[in-house]
Amino acid sequence: LSGYLMTILDYGSELAILAIGMTLVTAASGGQDISVGATIAVAGSVVLRVLCGGEVSPAALHAPIIVAFLACVVVSMLLGAFNGALVAYFKIQPMVATLILFTAGRSIAAWINNNQLPVINDESFGWFGNFIPGLPLPTPIFIAAICIIIIALVLRFTKLGLFTQAVGINSESSRLNGLNPARIKFMTYVILGLCVAVAGFIK
């Protein structure tokens, strides 16, 4: 693959990862999370803050890349849990509930790095958003493919997929059959937070 097709797949990989989580959210709650763009900004800012330590252009990384990724995952999943709690337990419409982070998220992202845009010059960190030497495709394409395969297996061989669809089709009927609709809706937003973390890390 080369040229425009590779570019399209590269840029589309971020959207593909987000679509995985958004599909679960839409299936369970019947709404969309409009704050994903702002949450990605927060996730990326957390990564930069951990790796750069508040400096604009550090000579070396201030923390291992895996630590930055884990911090990004924790923050993104907490933001997803915040949205999920508003929708699942406070019964707020998804678009209204996620409007909070949609409005505040980018300001939070700017605050994390003191309105600066740090630059990371470490070559190994660049591999996650570009190419790993020796591989024919950009790394984000591989990461997106792995995420799609994992969620497909989870939905196919676990109860999560069935429960998510059941709650989305008829929440009250699911409750009468022993499911906990609020918990399942909450879980889908947390999973979306994880997807946002991965997308924010590679982009």
Where are these regions (language model features)?
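Alpha-helical transmembrane segments within multi-pass membrane transporters and channels
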Residues: 55-102
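Transmembrane helix-bundle core of multi-pass membrane transporters
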Residues: 90, 94-159, 184-187
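Membrane-interface helix caps of multi-pass small-molecule transporters
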Residues: 24, 49, 78-90, 111-112, ...
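Interfacial loop-to-helix junctions that mark the boundaries of transmembrane helices
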Residues: 2-10, 59-70, 128-142
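Single transmembrane alpha-helix segments in multi-pass membrane proteins
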Residues: 2-57, 87-92
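Helix-loop-helix "hairpin" substructures at the membrane interface of multi-pass membrane proteins
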Residues: 64, 79, 83, 134-203
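Transmembrane alpha-helical core residues of multi-pass small-molecule transporters
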Residues: 40, 44, 75, 101-105, ...
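Hydrophobic alpha-helical transmembrane segments
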Residues: 8, 18, 38-39, 66-74, ...
